[in-house]
Amino acid sequence: MQTPPELKYAPSHEWLAPDGTVGISDFAQDQLGDVVYVELPEVGRVVTAGETVAVVESVKTASDIYAPASGTIVAVNEQLSGSPELVNQSPYTDGWLFRLDVTEESGELMDAEAYAAANG
């Protein structure tokens, strides 16, 4: 399982990059199986940490995606509408979900080492 050290991780398996980019972890995409659809939030939406903001559907199940921080959605990954498999192939780069202008991080975020220990 990959856990890039520069990211912070939520117990619900979302990651948050220093620039506000959000996605799901390698562990999460592996548990979901092949992703077939991603429902993304609207740009401009104000969200609170812990709020459901997106849905990732796989051949196995649908999973809610929660905001790992409070802030405003400033971008979404439009590539996912035609290529949802990017979430599986590249969860930390091409498979990102949305970007936040962060106002406050969740107090539950973990560093890579703690996240790996909790899910290893």
Swiss-Prot record:
- What is the UniProt remark on how the cofactor binds and its stoichiometry? Binds 1 lipoyl cofactor covalently.
Q: Which cofactor does it need?
A: (R)-lipoate
Q: Its domain of life?
A: Bacteria
- Which GO terms of the cellular component aspect does the record hold? cytosol; glycine cleavage complex
Record InterPro entries: 2-oxoA_DH_lipoyl-BS (IPR003016), Biotin_lipoyl (IPR000089), GCV_H (IPR002930), GCV_H/Fam206 (IPR033753), GCV_H_sub (IPR017453), Single_hybrid_motif (IPR011053)
User: What biological-process GO terms show up in the record?
Assistant: glycine decarboxylation via glycine cleavage system
Q: Which residues form a coiled coil?
A: none
Q: SUPFAM superfamilies attached here? A: Single hybrid motif
According to the entry, every stretch annotated as the Lipoyl-binding domain falls at: 19-101
| Modification type N6-lipoyllysine: residues | K60
Keywords assigned:
Lipoyl
A Pfam family (short name) is: GCV_H
Q: What does this protein do?
A: The glycine cleavage system catalyzes the degradation of glycine. The H protein shuttles the methylamine group of glycine from the P protein to the T protein.
PANTHER family noted in UniProt? GLYCINE CLEAVAGE SYSTEM H PROTEIN, GLYCINE CLEAVAGE SYSTEM H PROTEIN-RELATED
Q: What family classification does the UniProt entry report for this protein?
A: Belongs to the GcvH family.
Q: What is this protein called?
A: Glycine cleavage system H protein
Give the organism, scientific name: Deinococcus geothermalis (strain DSM 11300 / CIP 105573 / AG-3a)
